[in-house]
């Protein structure tokens, strides 16, 4: 699995108007929750984090991922291609998936379902909750990924031959966060431990602040949620 990650200082600019500097901390927590879910998905052999952010790189290694250095101001599709090349260099050719790193409500069982369904298609994708963007892109080989992330990427991936995998619009794998409205939507459904801890730390008034998604509660102390969130806010 390839997970491209922007530098936290540059990420989630559309959240800045409503949330100010908190957006940087949120981007950090989103990444950690997404990575945790990916690492705990059955069938995922290798995770490659593509990033120029030193904190993201350090924490990715701590959580068992490989790290591929990225350009300081990366293009998302270039980052995905870099990650796919890294996958080819460290293991046998095989299925690959690229995910956006802003899925704080992602559940391992959702990703497992998608990866299982993707085995039946040369290329496949999951649209975001709007039906316009893409949160997951898969291919049976690393060289076949052909990413086209960006505006209207769901249409572009379809036009390039990728099969759309149908998932409920309110499941975590489709709930990427770009706007305050997106944040409220995923918070109502439930977020992972890092984002939940940040909500508590910031006393954010979201229902998920005291109610992380099912399956995440048991890992909070083991993964050092509080210290990770404190690092994000420092």
Predicted regions, residues:
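The conserved acidic donor/metal-binding loop of glycosyltransferases
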Residues: 100-104
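Conserved alpha/beta core of the MobA/IspD/sugar-nucleotide pyrophosphorylase nucleotidyltransferase superfamily
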Residues: 152-218, 228-234
């Amino acid at each position: 699995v390839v997970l491209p990650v922007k530098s936290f200082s540059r990420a989630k600019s559309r959240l800045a108007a409503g949330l100010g500097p908190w957006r940087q901390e949120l981007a950090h927590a989103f990444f950690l929750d997404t990575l945790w879910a990916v690492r705990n998905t059955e069938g995922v052999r290798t995770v490659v984090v593509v990033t120029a952010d030193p904190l993201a790189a350090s924490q990715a290694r701590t959580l068992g991922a490989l790290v591929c250095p990225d350009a300081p101001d990366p293009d998302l599709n270039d980052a995905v291609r870099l990650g796919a090349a890294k996958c080819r260099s460290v293991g046998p050719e095989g299925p690959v998936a690229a995910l956006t790193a802003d899925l704080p409500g992602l559940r391992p069982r959702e990703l497992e379902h998608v990866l299982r369904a993707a085995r039946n298609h040369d290329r496949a994708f999951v649209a975001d909750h709007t039906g316009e963007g893409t949160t997951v892109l898969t291919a049976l080989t690393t060289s076949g990924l052909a990413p086209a992330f960006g505006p209207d990427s769901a249409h572009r991936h379809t036009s390039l031959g990728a099969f759309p995998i149908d998932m409920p619009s309110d499941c975590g794998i489709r709930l990427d966060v770009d706007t305050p409205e997106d944040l409220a939507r995923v918070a109502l459904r439930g977020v992972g431990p890092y984002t939940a801890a940040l909500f508590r730390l910031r006393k954010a008034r979201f229902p998920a602040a005291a109610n992380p998604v099912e399956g995440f509660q048991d890992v909070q102390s083991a993964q050092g949620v509080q210290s990770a969130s404190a690092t994000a806010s420092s």
